[in-house]
């Protein structure tokens, strides 16, 4: 049973939450669970931005199939190679053999180390500031090494000012049906989970995180779409999560 939600008319949220997990990365307690977020842009070309953990893969593929309809999947952008976002990559390529994998040089090094399937003629390598058009949407890519893995990058969609921020600006905590922070009392419900996530996941890479914040400051951002936690879309909410 599909559970997709619209971020915009042709941008879909395909993520799911795991409330059964006790320790995130076998290290950090998550008493309120955790969400694994993935996004799909349906345009002249279809673009999937990141994937999900194996634990929620069934729901993910149901959501993806429903959102695509009869369309093929043209691109999958990998902002972060950690297994909770790429464990489903091999199955994705099996289901959609014509898909092109978009990433940077380190992304493809990691894919070759993590998987055994052949990615020959299936890749599009991007560098700092490179762009990709899906038709009505233009994406730019910015490297964010060691936030918190060496291959990390973020993706900025120009027309609707959307930052797909990888693990940056995320939080612990499962989502309860709503996907936007402003659908919650976020100043009450999310501060502890946001701070705990930041301090445990990306905060220890202070200089690298500050470098990403400087890049983000130069972008006009209307939406922050992280890989964990709610989507931030109001100016007050975006300022709040960046400040936290």
Can you annotate each of these PLM segments?
Residues 4-65, 154-157, 161-165:
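Conserved beta-strand hairpin/beta-sheet module of binuclear metal-dependent hydrolase folds
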Residues 44, 55-102:
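Active-site metal-binding motif and surrounding structural segment of the metallo-beta-lactamase
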Residues 49-51, 73-81, 101-104, 163-166, ...:
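Active-site neighborhood of phospho(di)ester-bond hydrolases with catalytic His/Asp-centered motifs
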Residues 118-122, 182, 242-243:
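Short, hinge-like loop/turn segments at secondary-structure boundaries
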């Amino acid at each position: 049973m599909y559970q997709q939600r619209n971020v915009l008319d042709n941008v879909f949220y395909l993520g799911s939450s795991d409330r059964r997990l006790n320790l995130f990365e076998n290290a950090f307690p998550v008493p309120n669970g955790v969400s694994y977020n993935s996004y799909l842009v349906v345009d002249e070309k279809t673009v999937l931005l990141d994937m999900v953990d194996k634990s929620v893969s069934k729901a993910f593929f149901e959501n993806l199939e429903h959102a695509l309809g009869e369309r093929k999947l043209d691109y999958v952008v990998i902002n972060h190679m950690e297994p909770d976002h790429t464990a489903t990559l091999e199955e994705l390529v099996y289901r959609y053999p014509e898909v092109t994998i978009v990433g940077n040089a380190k992304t493809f090094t990691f894919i070759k180390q993590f998987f055994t399937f052949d990615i020959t003629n299936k890749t599009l390598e991007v560098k700092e500031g490179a762009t990709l058009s899906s038709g009505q949407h233009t994406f730019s890519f910015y490297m964010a090494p060691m936030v918190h893995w060496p291959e990390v990058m973020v993706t900025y969609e120009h027309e609707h000012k959307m930052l797909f921020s990888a693990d940056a600006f995320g939080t612990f905590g499962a989502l309860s049906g709503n996907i936007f922070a402003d659908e919650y009392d976020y100043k009450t419900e999310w501060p502890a989970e946001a701070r705990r996530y930041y301090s445990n996941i990306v905060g220890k890479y202070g200089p690298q995180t500050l470098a990403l914040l400087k890049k983000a400051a130069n972008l006009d951002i209307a939406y922050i779409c992280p890989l964990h936690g709610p989507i931030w879309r109001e100016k007050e909410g975006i300022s709040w999560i960046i400040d936290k």
